């Protein structure tokens, strides 16, 4: 998810453990981030059956790439790996806050309140459009050591988790945009094609 939410991000909290990676990255992401139109973004991801050092290495590379791209979330499919793995840090401007690592995440409950808010995506750079999502969620997942976890999330964190989890099912945020005129205009402006959107609204 693209970092377009600095004011809300300052009010959000994350939890998780990971090797400390500097957030002020320069240069290009170490991993290629695939863009709208690439087939890999439309595939369903597979569950991770064993959380080992190779998975932890991948999470570190994803976190570095997310920071280098100035993002607040990145899903494994965005780097061409169809595994159920997400890294998130909505506290991008807080150097002390640790990123959240979600392995095999599953949302167990959605709140009843819906909110519309502007989203962006590292796979669709430059495009920012409103998307309606539940404002609160509960989920279960495994951390980078393979331990089962549960958590509640609201606000920007809940939105970012839902956005990144969509990637695991081959869904992009533009698929959820209801204003088709705005969608078409933004896509054309940034050089993307409307035919690559699969509307689910």
From Swiss-Prot:
GO terms for molecular function: metal ion binding; peptide deformylase activity. It catalyses: N-terminal N-formyl-L-methionyl-[peptide] + H2O = N-terminal L-methionyl-[peptide] + formate. The keyword Metal-binding applies. Residues 1-24 are annotated as: Disordered. It is an enzyme of class 3 (hydrolase). Coiled coil: none annotated. This is Peptide deformylase. It comes from Prochlorococcus marinus (strain MIT 9312).
């Amino acid at each position: 998810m693209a970092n377009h939410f600095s004011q809300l991000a300052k009010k959000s909290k994350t939890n998780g453990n990971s090797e400390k990676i500097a957030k002020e990255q320069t240069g290009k992401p170490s991993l290629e981030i695939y863009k709208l139109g690439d087939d890999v973004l439309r595939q369903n991801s597979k569950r991770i059956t064993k959380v080992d050092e190779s998975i932890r290495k991948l999470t570190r590379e994803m976190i570095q790439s997310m920071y280098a791209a100035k993002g607040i979330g990145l899903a494994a499919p965005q780097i061409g790996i169809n595994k159920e793995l997400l890294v998130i840090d909505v506290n991008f401007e807080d150097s002390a806050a640790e990123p959240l690592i979600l392995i095999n995440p599953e949302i167990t409950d959605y709140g009843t309140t819906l909110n519309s808010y502007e989203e962006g995506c590292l796979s669709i750079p430059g495009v920012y459009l409103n998307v309606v999502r539940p404002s609160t969620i509960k989920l279960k997942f495994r951390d980078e050591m393979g331990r089962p976890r549960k958590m509640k999330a609201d606000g920007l964190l809940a939105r970012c988790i839902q956005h990144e989890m969509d990637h695991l099912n081959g869904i992009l945020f533009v698929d959820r945009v209801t204003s088709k005129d705005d969608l078409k205009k933004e896509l054309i402006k940034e050089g993307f094609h409307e035919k690559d959107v699969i509307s689910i609204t």
